[in-house]
Every structure is written in structure tokens, then in C-alpha cells.
Amino acid sequence: MIKQRTLKRIVQATGVGLHTGKKVTLTMRPAPANTGVIYRRTDLNPPVDFPADAKSVRDTMLCTCLVNEHDVRISTVEHLNAALAGLGIDNIVIDVDAPEIPIMDGSASPFVYLLLDAGIEELNCAKKFVRIKQSVRVEDGDKWAEMKPFNGFSLDFTIDFNHPAIDAGNQRYRLDFSADAFVRQISRARTFGFMRDIEYLQSRGLCLGGSMDCAIVVDDYRVLNEDGLRFEDEFVRHKMLDAIGDLFMCGHNIIGAFSAFKSGHALNNKLLQAVLANQEAWEYVTFEDEAEMPLAFKAPSIVLA
């Protein structure tokens, strides 16, 4: 049986909030089978839980938020959610003593290291996947995102930025997903932004934690970070990272083929909701025998070592 995963032990880290610029303590805890992914704000009394749920997602200019029925929100969940998807973690409680998850270095890599440091525990309960049965496509102007049946998990993402720092040949990225591929090829890709946008937001008291420590920053001509890029195509790889996190908001790894052109958090979420709303388009599946499971989700050495 392919089993659900959680952490072996509690792990904690501190970072800076992108919005407030203040220190945030992040604590990730093991959870029993069928708990799902739960984000929890412990700065509120009583603490407020935000289960990962496609319908609770709100896209702001700066990040992805989860918002409950009382309009309470937790912000900047997308990169941690991508790390959970990448390592196939089904059950976890994530505490923060702030309104947001810390931004860390702007990628999913610090979260991957924390999760691997905590260790991955298999639970004696079958892991549920969402298997795509019919193609579903959403559009917004010239932007689109699509999910098709496929026995695995593949991603094909194209961006379209007319900017001297972003080479025209580095605007498409394809990935046959596995935990190893995610960690090595996707998790280290950082978010990016324009210096003028960051300066404008900070002048309005927003994005106070934004800096070159947690993003690729560009002006009209070049990348301003002293160390440059981690990959030639880091921009499109980060957009794929975002999509992996966005699609995991259903709480389950997806068996299907995702492709997108100029998509972002809002359109990715619109696609996920469109899939889930069409009961003919998907089904839950479990695997009694590992040999039946798509190679994409086989537990790699780095995860269960």
C-alpha cells in the first residue's frame, strides 16, 4: 500500500515576513492520517486554523492567502505549499506567530531542508491522489492553464516577459515531476520583482520584508542581485514552483499533465477549482501495490532516507 506521509518530529525556524518585515517563528508538526495540511495562526487568541483548500485561496498582488469565513487570513503560503507537494507530505500542522509564513530566501528550498531535517514518516493509511480523467482548461485573455489525463505528473510552463534580463530562449520549462526532480530543479528558484514596484509598495508601508535576500530584483535592464541567477531560466522555474504549490491546495498530489501560458496564482487556482467542480473530470485513487503507482510519486532516496 502507498501510505500517507507526515513528519517524524517537530521542526522550527525563524524568518522575516514579506509584508510586515518582522520576525516570524514557524513551527511544523506531525499530524495523524487524514488530517490534511493545516496552517495555524498562533498570534490570535484563540488560534485560527486554515486547512489548505482551493476555495479558501485569495490572490493578492504580493502573495497567495488563505481566508476563512470571518475574513481572517494567513498570507504567503505558496512556497511552503510547493515544498509539501514536492515531498508528498499529506498531513502536517504549520504554526506561525504572525499573519504570514516567513518568506525565507524567496524559494521553497529552505522549507524542503526543514522538512527533510524533521524526517518523513509513513502512516498506516492509504495515500489518496487526485487523478485527472478529462481535460479542463481555463483562460484569461491570452493567458491559459490546462490539465489533461496523464499517468504521472508533468508540467509545461511558458512565460512571456519582454525584458533584457530574461532571455527569450529561457521562457519555457518542462518537468516530469518526482521529489528528486522538484528538489534539484525547481525548489531553489526564487520569486522575482521589479525594484520600482518594491520601492512603491514600501513607500505605502507594504512589502516591508522585501529585499534582495528574498527575491530576484530587476530594474529595467538587468538583475540587481550581486550573485546573479541560480539558473539561467530561474524566472520560469519559479513560476512552475508556484503552480506546484497552487495545485496542491486541494491537499492531494495530482496525477495528470499540467500546461500553462503566462499563468499565475489566480489562474492556477481557477483551474484547480474548475477541475474539482466537474465530478466527471477527476477521481480519488489509492494504490495497494507500489508497482501500479506512477513513477512520479515513488518515494526517492532523499525523502525517506
UniProtKB/Swiss-Prot annotation:
Catalyzed reaction equations: a UDP-3-O-[(3R)-3-hydroxyacyl]-N-acetyl-alpha-D-glucosamine + H2O = a UDP-3-O-[(3R)-3-hydroxyacyl]-alpha-D-glucosamine + acetate
Binding site for Zn(2+): 79, 238, 242
SUPFAM superfamilies: Ribosomal protein S5 domain 2-like
UniProt GO cellular component terms: membrane
Pathway(s) the chain acts in: Glycolipid biosynthesis; lipid IV(A) biosynthesis; lipid IV(A) from (3R)-3-hydroxytetradecanoyl-[acyl-carrier-protein] and UDP-N-acetyl-alpha-D-glucosamine: step 2/6
Group of enzyme by EC: hydrolase
Keywords: Hydrolase, Lipid A biosynthesis, Lipid biosynthesis, Lipid metabolism, Metal-binding, Zinc
GO molecular function (one): UDP-3-O-acyl-N-acetylglucosamine deacetylase activity
Active site (UniProt): 265
GO BP annotations, alphabetical order: lipid A biosynthetic process
EC number: 3.5.1.108
Cofactor(s) named in the record: Zn(2+)
Keyword Lyase: no
Primary role: Catalyzes the hydrolysis of UDP-3-O-myristoyl-N-acetylglucosamine to form UDP-3-O-myristoylglucosamine and acetate, the committed step in lipid A biosynthesis.
Cited PANTHER family: UDP-3-O-ACYL-N-ACETYLGLUCOSAMINE DEACETYLASE 1, MITOCHONDRIAL-RELATED
Family the UniProt entry places it in: Belongs to the LpxC family.
Protein name: UDP-3-O-acyl-N-acetylglucosamine deacetylase
Annotated organism of origin: Pectobacterium atrosepticum (strain SCRI 1043 / ATCC BAA-672)
